[in-house]
Amino acid sequence: MSKNSVIIVAAGKGKRMNSSISKQFLQIKNKPILYYTLNKFSTHESIDEIVLVTLEDKIEVCSEIIDKYSINKVSKIVPGGKERQDSVYNGLKAVSKDCEVVLIHDAARPFVTSDIIENGIRYANQYGAAACGIIPKDTIKIKNEKGFAIDTPNREDLFIAQTPQCFNYNIILDCHEKLKKHNKKVTDDTMVLEDYGKSVYLYEGSYSNIKITTPEDLILGEQILEKLT
């Protein structure tokens, strides 16, 4: 029977947080951010397996969090790579061989909703690849190399990508292997498919589905958690 697997990418060092502690291990309401992220997927009925990718020297810390909070469905904890795309590739190689749909999600994005997860799986099955996100609230400017505004794109045509990004497993694995062979750099997994001519369906995420990367995000995260609970 085919599985829906999720790769949680927790290999970042969190330089923008100005903290010696990696952002995924910082706490909101006395629990690490990683707990909230893992718990959201482990309690979702459509998720069969979690593969956690982290820094090699943080594997033990992650194991302790999983044990302390009795997180289910984590099949493996694997070390990350030099870049995010290397970490994702390590995760892809570690998922179960009967995986059909794989979701790739930032560990520092703890407020993903059940609907976002479910819709991602549905659209990945339908289109082969899907990513959630939001239309920007602010006006976006394009500037030239001298710092002057040269264009103002229509906000309705713009999309701020979030995670999870959801894929047919064989498609994303094949594209990552090509990426590695050609030594290309990308900043998210939809770019991996775009580089090889594959289409990605974009669907509605949530303005609360923030990635916690700065001290200000921690404050906002506490406010979001209070509203959710």
UniProtKB/Swiss-Prot annotation:
Transmembrane segments: none annotated. The keyword Cell membrane does not apply. It is an enzyme of class 2 (transferase). One of its GO terms (biological process) is isopentenyl diphosphate biosynthetic process, methylerythritol 4-phosphate pathway. Pathway: Isoprenoid biosynthesis; isopentenyl diphosphate biosynthesis via DXP pathway; isopentenyl diphosphate from 1-deoxy-D-xylulose 5-phosphate: step 2/6. It catalyses: 2-C-methyl-D-erythritol 4-phosphate + CTP + H(+) = 4-CDP-2-C-methyl-D-erythritol + diphosphate. Catalyzes the formation of 4-diphosphocytidyl-2-C-methyl-D-erythritol from CTP and 2-C-methyl-D-erythritol 4-phosphate (MEP). Belongs to the IspD/TarI cytidylyltransferase family. IspD subfamily. This is 2-C-methyl-D-erythritol 4-phosphate cytidylyltransferase.
